[in-house]
Amino acid sequence: MAPSARIKRILILGGTLEARLLAEMLAGRSDLSVTLTLAGRTAKPLPQPVPVRVGGFGGAEGLAQFLRAEKIDALIDATHPYAAIISANAARAAEAAGVPLLALRRPAWTKVEGDSWIEVNTIEEAVRALGQAPRRAFLALGRKELQPFTAAPQHVYLIRSVDPVDPPLAVPHAISIAARGPFSEAEDRALLKRHRIDVVVAKNSGGTATYGKIGAARTLQLPVIMLARPALPEVASVETVEEVLAWLDHAIASSVARGV
């Protein structure tokens, strides 16, 4: 849906580096009122440059009600590429409330020479792809995706997350590291070598902030079990923060020209 009214109030569905960068670039604009929403899954989120709303909306209907009540003029979905439910709710809510929606979707990674990827569609497939023989696996996944690996307790698992895994992974050998990225390729290469990792399990998150482990696996000639992205709603989308800014500026200029 293209913007048809004067855009002043913007809601950003966040939780990604791109959402934070977008908020930073909009924070100083006196012509806009920007709110950033976070799901609330991180105990101590980073400070944000604009007002923040933490927590869910209660599905698509709840989000639509919020858009109407707060008189939101534009909705930017800058959530993680694997936040399929949130993106689907955003699409339905925007349509119901008559609010223009733009999705900011970073491009997926693609294989380059030297990569050894085993591509899977589900976490359960990733567990099976590890095989029966004991391995040392780096699980570069969200905390919610870890529990299926209890079905394969013979492996040693290395887990790195901002907050502790709760409940802990119920396997004999799980190593948890609390750390907040981004991490460089050199840092991830050192991590993989230090823990003698022989396979990486990752989401195809795209972007540069978490690519270090992919480059490190390539350098160390380690296989990567890559979880494919989920299907996302077909809505207007761009790949960069700069394109979002251009979309907003065009919408604002168009509304001014129409005298809205």
Over which residues does each language-model region extend?
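N-terminal basic/disordered segments at the start of proteins
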Residues: 10-39
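N-terminal beta-loop-helix "entrance" segment that forms/cooperates
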Residues: 35-58, 113-116, 168-174
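Short, polar loop motifs at secondary-structure junctions
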Residues: 36-44, 104-110, 123, 143-146, ...
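Glycine-rich, highly charged phosphate/nucleotide-binding loops
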Residues: 50-70, 178-187
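Glycine/small-residue-rich loop that forms an oxyanion/phosphate-binding "nest" at active or ligand-binding sites
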Residues: 64-124
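Internal active-site segments that recognize and position negatively charged phosphoryl groups
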Residues: 124-158
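Histidine/lysine/aspartate-rich catalytic loop segments that bind and position anionic ligands
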Residues: 150-182
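C-terminal functional extensions of proteins
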Residues: 195, 204-216, 224-260
